[in-house]
Design a protein with these regions (language model features):
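Transmembrane alpha-helical cores of Major Facilitator Superfamily
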Residues: 59, 90, 94, 121, ...
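A late C-terminal transmembrane helix in Major Facilitator Superfamily
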Residues: 164-201
Length: 223
């Protein structure tokens, strides 16, 4: 199908799901009154070291994640074309599910910070290996993309968990909202920048710069 039709169908399904939820799932009797967004909660990013660490770790992760997903079809396209390329790109992105599940299970043993750091470091290493892996044998190329696709997203819930755990109790909701919003703003900048640069540079030159996010994120998480 053309991508426009896919987007139309997915949008209609999302709309139908929202309407179904609104029509069939009422608010419970103990629903608290909605709190107002507290902009001053942003101050915790500078005054509260654990919040600053997890938030900036998340920002670094968001620099890489969505831009990688945007570039996956181009990366796969260096080896495959047509339907096989589409299927392979889907598989690489879908492997992130395993990273999230595995990370959630490991948290019980080693904690969210270690899981987040390990996955961010692994995906960052995959960025830096790009100039060599793009020309590697097919099996090595496939394993590289599989590892990258698995680890690039698995740290996301861990950073959110750490921010929620470390945030002041009275501002958890506001801080999560603001941190997520900033994170997606970082993604927009990253996507636009790399899309522009992709017209001038090849993937071997471009992909290592995705590691800027993981490197900065790990540096902020060091404390």
């Amino acid at each position: 199908w053309p991508w426009q039709q896919v987007m139309d169908v997915v949008s209609l399904l999302a709309l139908a799901g929202g309407l179904l939820l609104a029509a069939t799932v009422p608010d419970g009797p103990h629903l608290p009154r909605a709190a107002r967004l507290q902009w001053r909660a942003l101050g915790a990013l500078w005054t509260h070291r654990p919040v600053r660490a997890s938030a900036f770790g998340y920002f670094g992760h968001m620099w890489e994640l969505y831009t990688f997903w945007v570039l996956v079809p181009a990366i796969v396209g260096t080896r495959l074309a047509g339907a096989p390329a589409s299927a392979a790109a889907f598989a690489v992105i879908a492997l992130g599910t395993l990273g999230c599940v595995a990370g959630g299970l490991l948290v019980r043993r080693v904690g969210s910070a270690r899981v987040a750091n390990a996955q961010l470091a692994t995906s960052g290493l995959c960025c830096l290996l790009a100039p060599w892996m793009l020309h590697a044998p097919d099996l090595a190329f496939a394993l590289w993309l599989a590892v990258w696709g698995t680890t690039v997203v698995g740290d996301s819930p861990q950073f959110s968990t750490l921010t929620a755990q470390n945030a002041p109790r009275e501002a958890v909701g506001s801080l999560l909202t603001l941190v997520n919003s900033i994170g997606f703003a970082v993604s927009i900048v990253s996507i636009q920048l790399f899309a522009m640069l992709a017209a001038r540079f090849d993937l071997a030159t471009l992909l290592p710069w995705l590691a800027v996010g993981p490197v900065l994120g790990l540096w902020m998480m060091r404390g």
